[in-house]
Amino acid sequence: MRTDWDLIVIGGGTAGLAAARQARRGGHGVLLVQDGEVGGDCTFTGCIPSKTLIAAAAQGLSSAHAFGRVRATVAQVAAAETADVLRSEGIAVLEGRGRLLGRGGVQVGGARLQAARIVLATGSRPVTPAVPGLAGSAYLTNETVFALAAAPSSHAVVGGGPVGCELAQALARLGTTVTLVEAGPQLLPKEEPEAAEVVATALRDDGVDVRLRAPLREVTPLDGSGRLRLRLGDGSVVEADRVLLATGRAAAMDGLGLDAAGVTLDEAGWVRTDRRLATSARGVWAAGDLTGRLPFTHAADAMGRTAARNATARVGWLPYSTRAVPWVTFTTPEVGRVGLTEEQAARHGGRVAYLPMAELDRAVTAGETRGYLKLIAGPRLVTRGALGGRVLGATVVCSRGGELVHEAALAMRAGMFTGRLAQTTHAYPSWSMAVQLAAGQLFQEVGGRRARPAVA
């Protein structure tokens, strides 16, 4: 194998694959360094297995059948992302752990390599809180839970973010007794309180015991039973067969040699990058979870492509922005989100349109009226046919929330005024009409509803 490359990508997850392919399409010599199987968290321990389990649980499959489907689906997706597939695309692959040496040098095992440019894409890892007794409890994380042959009879899920909520609901639907423990005052702390409350109610309806303001204080084994007792900060106790941690993630950078290369971290411990995704070290870029930006596969893909494009460009560069990047929590109902919340929009003179799903005919006919759509826009303008204000954000909570949010994301990306959305004919009765109806509220009364000023 050659030792001198145009670009070396360290990390073979979503961001790394996107970076390698982007550079290769530009005709550059690319080496991908990956410690383990190509594909990363999304394929093996994240999006693919979790969404498969969620779907299997919703379809009423048995626990064993559901976990079997997870393994089969992961294998199917992974087959399209192997090292051999990458080599067929002209990308060289070297298995091992890459370590920066400075001045474009990279050490992989006994091999010393050199590159004009380097992209770091090593992802993130689960965070384990310092709780007495937790280390000896054989706890699970997203990296280990999908290896189970079947779900245990009872499960304590610690952490009420997207991963915790999704897996708690899926496990409950598979017949497991689930307690979801969250230290804060609401589930989904990055979402609006109303969205979090809708999800909490849905989880309780599925049998999940939701405990809020209840930080985990201690884990102890029950005498001879193999079960665990969890003592919580609110004074209550939970007993369960297994504990699943969903308590956040940290940058995966052990042994990466950041100091040797002059790569600095921010206050939260993520690799510091600028708008180009360049690090503090000359010739080194970073993409994906490692940067501490949006921790989503689609964001990692976009960052990987942007970092590689900027790293290999002869002139000019493209900025990476998270402003119009949507994300989805795949509970039932789904929570789709892009841009500002109402509280954030209040600081910018924003206005809010609100549509309960009970007022959307498609939701009524489907019998799925739980949730709402909230569309956020800037100050109202009426000039040269531009009605309403520019779209600044949206929260969509409904069974199709993960699909509807993308119309708002496109409107944000295009700088569209809400009047354009309202004047675009939407098929009736469709879920997408929710966007049209909400957009109309931002410059006229629709169905007895009119937009109001955003409040903090």
Report each predicted region and the residues it spans.
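Rossmann-like dinucleotide-binding cores of NAD(P)H-dependent redox enzymes
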Residues: 72-79, 146-147, 152-156, 162-224, ...
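FAD-site-proximal beta/loop scaffold in flavoenzymes
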Residues: 135-151, 237-314, 382, 407
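Flexible, glycine-rich terminal cap/loop adjacent to redox cofactors
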Residues: 10-36, 41, 45-48, 52-53, ...
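A Rossmann-like FAD-binding core segment of flavoenzymes
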Residues: 92-95, 99-106, 113, 174-275, ...
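Glycine-rich dinucleotide-binding loop and its adjacent helix/turn
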Residues: 47, 122-177, 181, 210, ...
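Short hydrophobic core segments
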Residues: 8-10, 98, 113-123, 157-158, ...
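Beta1/beta-strand and adjacent pyrophosphate-binding region of the FAD-binding site
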Residues: 2-15, 151-161
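N-terminal Rossmann-like dinucleotide/flavin-binding domain of flavoprotein oxidoreductases
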Residues: 2-3, 22, 42-112, 191-217, ...
